[in-house]
């Protein structure tokens, strides 16, 4: 499927734009599942000022979606109408340390932020080492693993709104809850500051090694997957509910519930986005039928289904 090419109109309305605009650009290569249709417009801003300029001049009726490394994302097969903004590491991926503060652009990999903190002998950020995403996603969903969450370490987040205005948010402003933040969904996060605590370098590295060992042995990290599919309901583990419903190894087309970890869906090689989403919905139905619990998606789904 392809969309009307609106990039000439956008370029004409934004003569000072420095970033890259592409029409009908495939998104599958930008996601871990490797599925999905194109973006009507894919915009890669040159820097935060360029992003603000773009948003200020973008027609209000055009929907906007933001992606990082696509690790927690299903792009539907019909593609994404409107604008998809991809924050590239070269412009939004810097990580630096000042005292006990770790400052990171939102395209920085969570793992990289943990490594930089460890190099500065700062503890508290080790949990990020086991999260296969970027800081932007961590802010949006209060990403967490291995006993830590983004809310535990955030000092301040910087974001740009649809009018191109920059805002700064404290930890309290973010209104974090389990795997979510209360920040306006239209905000695009560009940077964050985290606080660590001075500690022993060897101990920090040891904890990071434990995190990596757990991922290697318990999660299908070599597969085409989107990470944890469903949020853990209060008092329950999603994977246990999925397993109890008899869904371990369940398949729909080229999509399968991982045999290694039941809360991971994988693309076995030829899955469509619809295969993966249908499998997820089938799992939700079976879990609710057996336990009475309605699982909530943790993976973000965007775009249109194929016609």
From Swiss-Prot:
Catalytic activity: UDP-N-acetyl-alpha-D-muramate + NADP(+) = UDP-N-acetyl-3-O-(1-carboxyvinyl)-alpha-D-glucosamine + NADPH + H(+)
InterPro entries per UniProt: FAD-bd_PCMH, FAD-bd_PCMH-like_sf, FAD-bd_PCMH_sub1, FAD-bd_PCMH_sub2, MurB, MurB_C, MurB_C_sf, Oxid_FAD_bind_N
Keywords: Cell cycle, Cell division, Cell shape, Cell wall biogenesis/degradation, Cytoplasm, FAD, Flavoprotein, NADP, Oxidoreductase, Peptidoglycan synthesis
Pathway(s) the chain acts in: Cell wall biogenesis; peptidoglycan biosynthesis
Cross-referenced Pfam families: FAD_binding_4, MurB_C
Enzyme class name: oxidoreductase
GO molecular function list: FAD binding; UDP-N-acetylmuramate dehydrogenase activity
Entry GO CC: cytosol
Subcellular location(s) of the protein: Cytoplasm
Cofactor section: FAD
UniProt-listed GO biological process terms: cell division; cell wall organization; peptidoglycan biosynthetic process; regulation of cell shape
Domain FAD-binding PCMH-type: 34-199
Coiled coil: none
Family: Belongs to the MurB family.
Protein's recorded name: UDP-N-acetylenolpyruvoylglucosamine reductase
Native source organism of the sequence: Bradyrhizobium sp. (strain BTAi1 / ATCC BAA-1182)
Gene symbol of the encoding locus: murB
């Amino acid at each position: 499927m392809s969309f009307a090419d609106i990039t000439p109109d956008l370029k004409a309305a934004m003569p000072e734009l420095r970033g890259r605009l592409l029409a009908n650009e495939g998104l599958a290569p930008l996601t871990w599942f490797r599925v999905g249709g194109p973006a009507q417009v894919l915009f890669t801003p040159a820097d935060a000022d360029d992003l603000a300029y773009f948003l200020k001049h973008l027609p209000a009726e055009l929907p906007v979606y933001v992606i990082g490394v696509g690790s927690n994302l299903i792009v539907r097969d019909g593609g994404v109408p409107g604008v998809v903004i991809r924050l590239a590491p070269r412009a939004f991926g810097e990580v630096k340390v000042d005292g006990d503060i770790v400052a990171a652009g939102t395209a920085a990999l969570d793992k990289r932020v943990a490594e930089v903190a460890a190099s500065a002998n700062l503890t508290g950020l080790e949990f990020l080492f086991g999260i296969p995403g970027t800081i932007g996603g961590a802010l949006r969903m209060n990403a967490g693993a291995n006993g830590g969450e983004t809310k535990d370490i955030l000092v301040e987040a910087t974001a740009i709104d649809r009018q191109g205005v920059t805002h700064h948010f404290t930890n309290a402003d973010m209104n974090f809850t389990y795997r979510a933040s209360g920040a306006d969904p239209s905000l695009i996060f560009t940077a964050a500051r985290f606080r660590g605590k001075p500690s022993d370098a060897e101990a920090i590295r040891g904890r990071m090694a434990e995190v990596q060992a757990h991922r290697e042995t318990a999660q299908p990290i070599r597969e085409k997957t989107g990470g944890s599919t469903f949020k853990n309901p209060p008092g329950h583990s999603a994977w246990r509910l999925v397993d109890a419903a008899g869904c371990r190894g369940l398949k729909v087309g080229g999509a399968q519930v991982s045999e290694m970890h039941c809360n991971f869906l994988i693309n076995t090689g030829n899955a469509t986005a619809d295969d993966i989403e249908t499998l997820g919905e089938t799992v939700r139905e079976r879990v609710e039928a057996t336990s009475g619990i309605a699982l909530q998606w943790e993976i973000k789904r965007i775009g249109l289904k194929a016609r």
